């Protein structure tokens, strides 16, 4: 049973006086939206230089960086969070160790957070291709893997959830071939021939890690968490192989939510994308700023200006202050620095960028949204800091959302890759969040109780404040 809210409890005495004439809770009309759901994404930089190192670091509870990551998450207390750059290994032992040794342990007064459910899966980073993908004459470098990486699983990701993951309905697109996307931006050489041979393209996956659709059951309403981490649009040449791959990786989700995905085939052979009435939230580090950085033109706009997507436009005061203090490339940026989510080199470039996103479907009510980026005079600045960073060069991005409620309840489907653990106190796991958070650093955008964030202001605000 869900706990009573403060508002409900305050009404009980009056309700009891008129019990004979008042409708019972069972007779009351259900809300048209879900309760407030706090959803977050965080590139936590929990990647390591060799396989097994992350597992070793998490075996004990004294790793400083992992403690900072956990405290950052505890300060926001999201119901669902995607963590990018969390090295993957097949038995998910690191996922469990981070939960038990860090998330469920208090840090500097922050309350422990319990996630009974989690998902992690294999990725293309570090998987040897056997081909010279970067044209340097070698076939064994990290750039010759299907996704840049020194070993299979490096730069993977994990999703933690307070709600059940419908594991038998998870869809992944790790092995979908880039060439099979209609109109794919395949790179070419200066003479117009393909950068990659037909032999390479017949094995080349579009996703540099994986793209995964995780249906999560939120009290009978299914929310599709669409998680990915496209390749950075940098470290290439005139052929723009990484820029173009980044563009098409972003396009995959744009097509998936817009009824343009008939060509898409998942790793189990099922075709197509989401139905028009599906609830979803796109999460991840997409390595693409709408106006600055190295992106192929229009890359992230495929999502930000999509009629199917709401830009929650999270902000922070810390991002604005750091752009001013760090100067350099930031002084010529066009994106409002309040939207920045990554703190990168400023001399000469690229400067701080907006590259991490929480993007729900149209019809979702946005209560608040923010970037966890404290200012330097805030005690919590120790969690973000300056280079070399104590935690990550990315900032956690969060949004408090009310999704349209489904008419047909759905049932959870636990499996071996979806684990349930008791809370630290031994009580039943808390699977809901009131959404009442205080003390979150930064400026949060609120649109009022029950207000719908209008799509028409997405790009207007970005450009008018640039």
Residues covered by each model-derived region:
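A substrate-binding/cap region within the structured catalytic cores of diverse enzymes
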Residues: 143-185
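Bacterial N-terminal signal peptides
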Residues: 9-20, 450
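Active-site His/acidic residue clusters
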Residues: 226-245
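A cross-kingdom C-terminal cell-surface attachment/processing module
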Residues: 438-461
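N-terminal, active-site-proximal structural segment of metallo-dependent hydrolase catalytic domains
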Residues: 27-157, 187-204, 219-223, 236-238, ...
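Cytoplasmic C-terminal tails of single-pass
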Residues: 462-466
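C-terminal low-complexity, Ser/Thr- and acidic/Pro-rich disordered "stalk" regions positioned immediately N-terminal
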Residues: 405-434
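Metal-dependent phosphoester-hydrolase catalytic domains
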Residues: 167-171, 216, 244-250, 255-282, ...
């Amino acid at each position: 049973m869900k706990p009573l809210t403060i508002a409900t409890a305050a009404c009980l005495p009056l309700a009891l006086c008129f019990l004979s004439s008042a409708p019972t809770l069972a007779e009351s009309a259900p809300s048209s939206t879900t309760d407030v759901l706090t959803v977050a994404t965080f590139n936590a930089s929990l990647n390591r230089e060799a396989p097994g190192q992350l597992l070793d670091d998490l075996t004990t509870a004294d790793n400083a960086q992992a403690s900072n990551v956990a405290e950052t998450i505890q300060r926001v207390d999201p119901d669902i969070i995607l963590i990018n750059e969390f090295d993957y290994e097949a038995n998910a032992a690191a996922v469990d160790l981070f939960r038990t040794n860090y998330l469920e342990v208090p840090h500097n007064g922050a309350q422990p957070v319990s996630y009974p459910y989690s998902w992690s899966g294999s990725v293309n980073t570090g998987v040897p291709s056997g081909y010279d993908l970067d044209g340097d004459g070698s076939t064994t470098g990290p750039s010759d893997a299907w996704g840049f990486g020194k070993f299979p699983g490096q730069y993977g990701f994990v999703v933690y959830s307070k709600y059940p993951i419908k594991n038998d309905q998870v869809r992944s697109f790790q092995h979908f071939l880039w060439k099979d996307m209609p109109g794919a931006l395949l790179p070419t050489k200066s003479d117009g021939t393909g950068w990659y041979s037909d032999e390479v393209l017949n094995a080349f996956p579009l996703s540099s890690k994986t793209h995964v659709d995780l249906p999560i059951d939120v009290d009978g309403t299914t929310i599709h968490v669409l998680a990915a981490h496209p390749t950075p649009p940098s470290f290439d040449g005139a052929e723009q192989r990484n820029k173009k791959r980044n563009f098409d990786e972003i396009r995959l989700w744009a097509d998936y939510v817009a009824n343009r995905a008939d060509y898409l085939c998942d790793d189990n052979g099922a075709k197509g994308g989401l139905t028009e009435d599906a609830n979803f939230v796109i999460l991840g580090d997409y390595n693409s700023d709408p106006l600055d950085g190295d992106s192929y033109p229009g890359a992230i706009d495929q999502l930000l200006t999509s009629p199917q997507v709401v830009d929650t436009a999270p902000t922070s005061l810390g991002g604005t202050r750091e752009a001013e203090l760090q100067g350099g490339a930031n002084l010529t940026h066009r994106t409002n620095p309040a939207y920045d989510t990554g703190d990168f080199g400023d001399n000469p470039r690229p400067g701080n960028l907006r590259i991490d996103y929480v993007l729900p479907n149209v019809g979702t009510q946005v209560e608040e949204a923010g970037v966890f980026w404290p200012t330097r005079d805030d005690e919590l600045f120790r969690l973000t800091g300056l280079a070399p960073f104590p935690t990550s060069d990315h900032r956690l991005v969060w949004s408090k959302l009310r999704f349209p409620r489904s008419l047909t309840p759905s049932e959870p489907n636990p499996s071996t890759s979806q684990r349930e653990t008791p809370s630290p106190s031994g009580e039943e796991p808390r699977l809901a969040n009131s959404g009442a958070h205080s003390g979150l650093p930064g400026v949060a955008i609120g649109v009022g109780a029950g207000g719908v964030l209008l799509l028409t202001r997405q790009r207007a605000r970005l450009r008018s404040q640039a």
